[in-house]
Amino acid sequence: MICQFKRLIYPKAVTAGDASYMIALYRPCEKVMDAAGNVVSEIKAVGYCLPTADNLRYDMRGRWSRSAKHGIQFEVEGFDEVIVPSKEGVIAYLCSGQIKGIGPKTAEKIYAMFGQNTLTVLDHEPEQLLAVSGISKTKLKKICDSYLASRGARDVVAFLAPHGVTPNRAVKLYKQFGEHTMDIVRNHPYRLCEMVGVGFKTADRIAVSMGFDPLSPERVDEGLMFTLTDAELKGHLCMEKHSFLKQCLKLLDTEGLTEEMLAVRASRMLESGRLASYDRQVYRAVTARTEQSLAWAVYRMLTYEKAGSHVNIDTEISAEEKKQGIQLASEQRHAVTTALTSQLSVITGGPGTGKTLIQRFLLDIYRRKNRGAKIICCAPTGRAARRMEQATGFPATTIHKALGLLAGEDGDYCEPEMLDADLIVVDEVSMMDIYLANHLFRSVPHGSQLVLIGDADQLPSVGPGAVLSEIIACGAVPVVRLDRIFRQSYGSRIAANAKLIRHGNLSLEYGEDFQFYDSCDMSTSAQQIETLYLQETAKYGVDNVALLTPYRQKTETGVNALNERLREKLNPQDGKKPEVAYRKRIYRLGDKVMQIKNCEDISNGDIGYITSVTRDDTDSVLTVDFGDGRIAEYDGSDLEMLDLAYASTIHKSQGSEYKSVIINLQCAHAVMLVRPLVYTAITRAKERVLIVGERRALCIAIKRTDTEQRGTMLSARIKELISNVKGDHYNGNLAQ
């Protein structure tokens, strides 16, 4: 039936492409009879992703239903726009709000260039729109995605919306599977697990709603895969056989399903190559290949000849000491010597032990000894790289940029480039997960030296693996551990207390540079944090103060709540500052923000300030200045990449350093209270640490080592390659 949008009943307002459940009234444009045979003057329609542009007509598909509570209503199963083949009709469709990035002015320009061929261009040659002034590559992508959602992917978007799949994700599914998407969704829902962001639980909900057999091999196989994928999200590369099967059985929760049945399916997946095993551990095949690849790369570097003579290095170190007016301690001298004479080496230690000084000596001596040699300094995050550059005086970049790794639409990365360097120095190595480490090691040219620097006692990487700890544990890589604290200036209690925490010692020393503020409830803590934050930022400046807390959400002292609270103190709305609302967040001119996804020029974790808020034909555009001449613009869904940055999680602070750090620790933080967490938090500070919360929470964290050791066999694989002795591997049969 042909009809036109009249008004929304529920919800009260929606944005374009909203995937929520909707109830709306439509005006029929032709004679329409309801389920009772009555001619109607308006239609109450229900469904997901209903059209709300009042300047278009729609051909609605679906069925009438009747209930005692809601009466007669039309359940929408799909719809198409009725586009009048005229200038007015095409322009009305283009600027109806369903195609992001096209407003009235842009619609006029497009029609002026393509006329009645406009929709053909959108369907088959959308790149031609780049010829229209005002349409950039970024805007073209937005136009294409929303046009696809409003046309070919519409049925997919509507079908998946009740199952929690966002319109953006549904459009990506449509891009991947094309015209076969609906067939796959209805008949092979577990194939949706192939798509990044659509996990087993979503696919399972869809399958169950359509009556799939809960004991089907397809469901069991994807349950096994999801069990391992979920473990990777928690930092593990692999799972022990029995733990793996037990966890999957709990996930599938199906009557009649046993561990023995799961073992048979898992064995077949081993045979087909979807799973892999090593020494009674089970992996996703791609993860096992990555771990083995990294082990081979480490082994390969260990087989190279030594890089230089100790005698020459001793002379060079003495000359550098004289030049800098500093005398290295014996362990620091040993670290520089090891790095310069080894193809692969590790330098690890806590704050105040001289890691930065060692880097300066290492780089200066290497450059003097090897004139014309190429050096690359890098770190996992942009902030860590800039800190490395400031401390050493050598240019530094992120590992991703050094390798030419640019994230694609779904977070996948292209193949890394071979590094053009003779010496590669990597800082903050504890933040590297198995995948980034494998990319890095595979890109080191034959004969080049690699120096890994980091603190093995910090939190492990967000991604899976424990790369730094495992490389140290293999016992084959030259490792220098720095344990002696040399920092004697203001803030020395920080380094001393960090060492105590590392050893589980509760006898911390308090004073002007290390303070504790008792507060047993969240509300009092939030108020105390606000007072201290305003005090510290007034003294040191906003950029030199960090507010760190374990949780993002849930409490008054979570990152989200603190960000809103502090923004209203530091950057309040005075009625003149333009701002943009996106989802549940407001971005305001002058706000301090953080990039939370790697882009070509801006790295995950980079912090900047919103310098302008403008509006183009359809969207508000934010301009963010990240410093060092790096300026980026954000509009529409790009805002997903920004977060307020007055407060941060402790995990997100890794690789950063501040003059003053405020930390919140409450007993309610429960499972987050582990030694590496509090150690990482306090070692972000150079001059002052202010802890707000419960002393018992601090004691729990110090006494509690990481709750669960990460499942990884990297160290064992390296040892096996060195010894050339095969381990106790599976024969491919998990049913044994």
State the predicted function of each range:
Residues G325-T341:
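N-terminal pre-P-loop "Q-motif" helix
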Residues T341, V346, F361, I365, ...:
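Conserved helicase motor core of SF1/SF2 NTP-dependent helicases
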Residues K355:
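Conserved lysine of the Walker
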Residues A456-D601, T611, L721, H729:
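Conserved helicase motor core of P-loop NTPases
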